[in-house]
Amino acid sequence: SNPFEILFIIYPDFNSLDFAGPFEMFFRIPNVKITLASPSRGNVTSEAGLVIGGTEKLANIERCDLLCIT
């Protein structure tokens, strides 16, 4: 079957706990595909300096089953 698609939208100066907790939980669920997106693709830096790399451009995402906004 198709994986359950979870999209995390990550904005600059995000709170790393708001991202890491849900990400770690969803990561452990079988048959889940997690996509990280930001307004302008690439690296996004948290308010504490944590860098999340390789995000997709939000405008290019067509669909998801669950949306998480950080």
Residue ranges and their predicted role:
Residues S1-T70:
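Extended, subdomain-level signal for the structured scaffold at the beginning of enzyme domains
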